[in-house]
Amino acid sequence: MKKYLAEMVGTFVLTFLGCGAAVSLNCGVDTASVVGTAMAFGISVIAMAYTIGGISGCHINPAITLGVFLSGRMNGKDAGMYMVFQTIGAIIAAAVLSLLVWTDPSLVEGTATGANACASNNVFNGLLAEVLLTFLFVFVVLGATSKTNGATNNFAGLAIGLSLILIHLVGIHYTGTS
């Protein structure tokens, strides 16, 4: 149960801080907003990797859990439970953010609670960006945490968090990076 709760808390932190930064920056597509949002997501992953990584592996994302499962590093029961607890953590974070937004009118301006300027992109571009960027992120996570590639796992959290920053820098323009 401890590893499932760690995933819930880690996903809460990632969602609350990453999406909280996006909301605080009014989900803007200006350079400062994009960089700030990307940094918030990446640094959240780095912090959680070193906080809960030893407990659960710090997947904090169902796509990562699916990749770990498909690579044979995790059984189906744990993968399913991770995804359930990750979803619960994300829902709690979204609820807390909603409460904060609705009690602070300055955050309910422009597009802070809905589609941003990225909404003008077509579905194909968005789907292509999401699939490719998710693949790249899972690829980095699996490589950085592999025991057979000679990588120093002490730095896996840093490599993963920095790659998430890069993924957001690219993906925010297309979809807002889910």
Q: PLM features: residue spans?
A:
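Membrane-interface helix-loop junctions and terminal tails of multi-pass membrane proteins
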Residues: 1-178
